[in-house]
């Protein structure tokens, strides 16, 4: 120690001379848990077997006029109720 007064003020400094730094051995790492890989889920096309052109399904409302029109990727469904109210539905794909 360079300063004897420091050893009196800080008695723990005396331990530094007897301390020899050692690096503890590293523990052997555990192997990663092994599990069989799950098969990847394949997304099937929801549109398989669906006709490419829209068709009007049979309905109990055949007595009520209604139309189905397509413009690009938009589907327009127009119907009129028995009371005369016109309902328009647009579906953008």
UniProtKB/Swiss-Prot annotation:
Gene this chain is encoded by: E4
Keywords (A to Z) from UniProt: Early protein, Host cytoplasm, Host G2/M cell cycle arrest by virus, Host nucleus, Host-virus interaction, Modulation of host cell cycle by virus, Phosphoprotein
Post-translational modification (record): Phosphorylated by host ERK. The phosphorylation triggers a structural change that enhances keratin binding and protein stability.
Record-stated family: Belongs to the papillomaviridae E4 protein family.
Assembly: Assembles into oligomeric complexes. Interacts with host CDK1. Interacts with host SRPK1; this interaction may favor expression of late viral transcripts. Interacts with host cytokeratin components KRT8 and KRT18.
Main function: Contributes to multiple aspects of the viral life cycle including viral genome amplification, suppression of suprabasal cell differentiation and egress of newly formed virions. Induces host cell cycle arrest at the G2 phase by associating with and preventing the nuclear entry of host CDK1/cyclin B1 complexes. Inhibits cellular DNA replication by preventing loading of host replication licensing proteins MCM2 and MCM7 onto chromatin. Within the cytoplasm, associates with host kinase SRPK1, a splicing factor regulator, and inhibits its activity.
Native source organism of the sequence: Human papillomavirus 35
Localization annotation: Host cytoplasm; Host nucleus
Protein name: Protein E4
């Amino acid at each position: 120690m360079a300063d004897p007064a420091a050893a009196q003020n800080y008695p723990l400094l005396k331990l530094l001379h007897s301390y020899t730094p050692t690096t503890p051995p590293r523990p052997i790492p555990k192997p990663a848990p092994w599990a069989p890989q799950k098969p990847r889920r394949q997304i099937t096309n929801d549109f398989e077997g669906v006709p490419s052109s829209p068709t009007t399904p049979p309905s109990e409302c055949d007595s009520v006029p209604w139309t189905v029109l397509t413009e690009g990727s938009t589907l327009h469904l127009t119907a009129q109720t028995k009371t005369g109210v016109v309902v328009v539905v647009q579906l953008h794909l």
